[in-house]
UniProtKB/Swiss-Prot annotation:
Modified residues (Phosphoserine): 595-596
GO biological process, one term: 5S class rRNA transcription by RNA polymerase III
InterPro entries in the cross-refs: Sfc3/Tfc3_C (IPR046488), Tfc3-like (IPR044210), TFIIIC_Bblock-bd (IPR007309)
GO terms assigned for molecular function: DNA binding; RNA polymerase III general transcription initiation factor activity
Region (Disordered): 470-515, 791-826
Residue ranges the UniProt entry marks as DNA-binding: 485-497
Top-level taxon of the source organism: Eukaryota
Protein name: Transcription factor tau subunit sfc3
Basic and acidic residues bias spans: 798-826
Stretches of the chain forming a coiled coil according to its record: none
Key word Transcription regulation present: yes
Function recorded in the entry: TFIIIC mediates tRNA and 5S RNA gene activation by binding to intragenic promoter elements. Upstream of the transcription start site, TFIIIC assembles the initiation complex TFIIIB-TFIIIC-tDNA, which is sufficient for RNA polymerase III recruitment and function. Part of the tauB domain of TFIIIC that binds boxB DNA promoter sites of tRNA and similar genes. Cooperates with sfc6 in DNA binding. Localizes to chromatin insulator sequence without recruiting RNA polymerase III and plays a role in nuclear organization.
Subunit structure: Component of the TFIIIC complex including sfc1, sfc3, sfc4, sfc6 and sfc7. The subunits are organized in two globular domains, tauA and tauB, connected by a proteolysis-sensitive and flexible linker. Interacts with sfc1, sfc4 and sfc6.
Amino acid sequence: MDSLIRHCSEEIALDGSSGCSIDRLWEFAANFFFRQGIVQNLDDNYKTFVWPLILKEDGIEVWIEDEDATGLRSKMQEIPWNYQDITIELRARIRLFASEDRQWLTLTYKTKTDSKIQPLAFELLSCISRYRQEGVDRIQLCKETKQEPRSVYGRIQALEDASLISKVAINRSRAQTALLVLKRFESENSTINETVAQVSGKQIYNTEKIRSNICDAVQSSRNGICRHVDARAMVNLNHSRWERRYYARQVTYLHNNGYLRKCLTFVPNSPERCIRCLQFIKPYISSLDATEDDVDFTEVDDIPEDDELEEEEPLLPSKEEFDASFLQPLADVGPTLPQWSRFRPLEFQCFVLIRNAGFHGVITLQILSGLTGIRFNKPLFKLLGSLVEHRSSVPNHLSHMSITRFEDKTKKSRQYRYFTLQSQLNRLIRDGIPAETISKLLPHVHSLAGEFSPIDSSLFLNSLHHKGNMESNAEVSPDGMTLLPRKRGRPRKSANISVTSSPIRPSKNENNLPSLAISPVSEGFIQNATISTPSTSSNLSIAGSLTPSKTSRIYRGLAPLKNPEFNEDHVKKAEHLEPLLNVSSSVPSKNFTVSSPDHLKYGNTSSLQVSDSQSSIDLDSSFHYPVSVDSQLSHSTGSLMANFSSPTKKRRLESVDFIFLQRKGLILSYLVEQNGAFEISRKMFEDLADLKVRRNPETSRTVMDRRTFQQTLEKLMQEKKVRKLVIATNNGLGKLVRKDIVVQYDMKPDSPRFQQLRAQITTPEIEKQSTPEILKDVDVDFLKRNTSLSRRKSMPAEIKRHKESSETKPVDKEEVKKNEKEKDDPMRLAQQLLESLAPDFALHENTQQKSPVEKPKKLRKDRYASVEEFDYFSSTEHASKRSVKRFKNDFTSDEDETLIRAVVITQIYYGGTNRLIKWEAVQKCFPNRDIYALTRRYLSIRQHTKFKGLQQFLSENWQQMYKDAVSRKDLMPYPDSVDDFDPTPYVKASCRPYMISSSNLATTRLPRDLVDVYETYNIEVVKQETNFREMIFDPSLSVASKMNAYCDMPFTMPLSLNDKQNNEGDENCEKGQLFDAKSTIKSIVAIPDATYDARFSQERLMQYPEDILIAAHQELLDKRIITRVNSENSRLQPGRNFQFTEKFASSLKSPLPPFLLSQAKRFNKFLLEGFQNHKNHLFEETSNSGTLACILDLLSQGKLQISIVGSKFNEYGLSEGYRTRLLEHDNINVTLVLSGKESESKKNYGVTEKLATPPSHEPRLWLNGKCELIEMIWMNIEQSIVYQLLRKPGILRSQLTNLLFPGLEPREFNEVLDYFIAAGAAIEKDGLYLNHNYLFKLT
């Protein structure tokens, strides 16, 4: 029952500030029984029984929500203790909360005042905790807490940094997202696949094994010689900088100790180049046992026994290890309960695991995985740390622990290892710490150190009961898990310092006790001590109130450790302990007994047996009892009792850092090994690690970090064991280097060892570096490396040349000094300031004339900048930045095009491959560019998609264009000599519009058979049931199949402002409205930033009902035509929070299909109305409607012009920056204005910004002379005719004209059709048919 109540109250506290409803409370109870495997009917009678018990639990509050929908809550004044009296309506409104302090302690492990978590972040933490089983994503979190998404993001980061929550990667709706869960429930979460932020679990290297592997790798190579880098790859230390440095340190160690030799070898291909190699000398002899060879890459530790220990250690301790004073008997809680650690004291479980680990200790990760069944729980890890580090919160049974840092060099994280007192004493003796030091330290150890004492029941009762205990002022956490540290700050000045241990009851016969106390000295300690006193034989026993059988049952885990190899080493050190064993001077015989006081009723039987035959002692080092000290014993005798005081004084507890002692012993041993002096260097740290392994082969090899070494050294200096000297020496390269030396405290400056070390340090490093031997005529194997991974970035030629020139140029020291003086000269600075404030314009002009290719200033990278900002080009037009990459001093788009045209035109007549271009002739088009820059630029752009079509078009059509131009006398014939050839006029001629005429129709290709029609022209039959409008952006369909599907589709005009009234009341036009709304949205999205008008966009969109607009937006999003833009600035501007998708933009880039040209007549009507109504943004609205050819027609006739100066359309009808939101400046950022000649002819129009009236006749197709557009359109006309004749035999010429190309003039269409008939492809006889012979050819 108590477990259930505690479980429910814990779950209520975990719900935090969101609270817990009554239904949820019974879910917790049902979950508790289910996990335990207990069948319990949660009916109303049982709930009535449990309800008041839960409400009486400390820190549980009952709140009620208001009846209105505001959701406000208030604390209930009259608590309904009888569950049956609560109505169903009232149950829905009642919420259970834990008190604020308990909420904060449960979720953040700290009180609200001590925690650094903000209250708003705590709200998020409460919400995440509420969904602790299933997880919650960020969007849901924002909705529930009603906080801004940006703020939530930062607070989640803060909670994650505090290791309170964890992100869990999941796949939701085909996209990877993250759920947020409490860190402690990470493994219990039902949606977990892989945590996003995994803890570093990289391997820790076994250095001995690595050194052995390096030697084996070099030995296995040919001739025993291997490249330095190849050996590194063979031992798999090639992944990170740390691994490479680690490998280099080990190679240096092997070289210094004579296992390998560093040498150089000539490369066979280039004899002047040497490479570093390693030569094998002798196999490596490891100082570790052979049993450790298998454990070089263990994840947590290098000790094989730890894995076995984890398997043997049950989740819960056995029943015998509990005491009757513990609140809940074990029978109620089975070992299968996964959430056990939340409702039982962690420290109890920790102790059992640590005690059974013995000498090796247990690492934090093993404690957590062994006890809680979770991977790595940082909050619990912090709890363990606080139990050890904060003296005020250490329970009695944990005060014997100490921590050591365990290195994980891969991620620089800290893991902590926990030890029992017994294993620490064993370590200290093995490490050679003097017995005097140990005896001085032992009195400071807590009185209950060494074994587990029974649980103090006050730890787990409510704090109300605990407040009655006035002798302890430490707070107990509400969940009864641990004692909390006192508040920070300076402690109050008082003589009586309270201790957190359970109060000791005074005894009646306290004054009659003999003067003896058993200290927690380990068996090995006394065992070594008894060797020097073989004659002494005594039997000491202290009988407590517990029987020996119970004692042996509780402490059966302790077994004596035998360390025979240390017996002889510590004979002398053990002599200090002789007085300990001679304390029986006041005892009449060898056997004596001492009765323990009543207040030690929890004590255990401890026996000390010393005999001649066995040098073994069975000592239960559980407690030493603080009793009064005999006056005869003094500190000078070396007794362990000397510093003990009476229990009435309550001496302050001192923590003993055994690890610090170990480190001090290690450094002093190294000092002795180095003859009393050594230098602090990288080698010293490696030697310390090796010495540590030599002293105790069972430990893992870890390198001490500098901070730890510094702290230990400072302690040794305070104790006047060592001195630290600093020497500044010249390293031989003209630089002073600091060297730190550690010497024995009593070493004199004239000591030979000090002089020797000083001479060694002051030797310049250049002299120390012995040049490695160069091996000649030796074959070395080269490992094949993955070139793709190791390929370096090629340096641009300009930078390379600049580097070379700067290296070769000698540095003039005087000139450098002069420049520095000029920089610092105040008059010079003032003059520069004046010049910058008032520049001379005439001077500026002269400098521009002298250096036309001067380096311009750096350009601000602004994608949507207006054209005026692009002032770094020679022409006023700017180039797009997306298609061809341009730098600030690079070619413009016009220069690129001119270069391609000049090269092709020169090549066609004068020949020459790409390598043998007549660059002298091409350079005449670019007087300011050198040939080297032209060749580089040509090589970089000739393969670009933009210019491939241009090169192909010129190579196919230039001969004919050239002949026509020469016959019209527009061009002179090519000169015989290439030296006289200037390609400039020829390049200009190639840019002119070039019309297809009957003269060159013979060269065009007609389809030869039906396969040619379907394959070459990619004709597909479109199924009738397909929704054609949805397929307009389907890239898989060919031009002809789209044309066939769309040739009868009406042209839809965007709704104007005047149409609003006409459409009102028309209920049947919803589909048309949806289509128009989509067109309007697309046209608004296409408006560029420069001409965007929020008011205009809003007016256009407000014509449609809200549901139509939402549906239109959703349909455009579903069809991937537009996508959302996540930007704070554009949220309130209609049209700015969307952009065209890449798929849509790329569909616009395709060549103009014929079906778009069929709408010219309808577009002409629309254009006419638009110009008459003086509509703004006309071009933006129509540019995506497939009417680009019609606008080009008007432009070609000179009726219109575009307002951006020199803006042009490329071969596809769109500019190269089509991928961006606006399809970029050249394409859509334009408005149509009257051309110059039109405005002059109109007398009424004085301003050229007025819109032009369209021409009276229908627009005809204008063919741009650039690239392959002419050929593409010609092929489309051919293809369309063949396809229509196959589809509709006998169609009349007029029908075909209207069906296909109403935008063409009759003369132009008849010319194409006449050629078609003349070529024998069609017959005209009462209608048009495909020629029978031609049809026969096709089939």
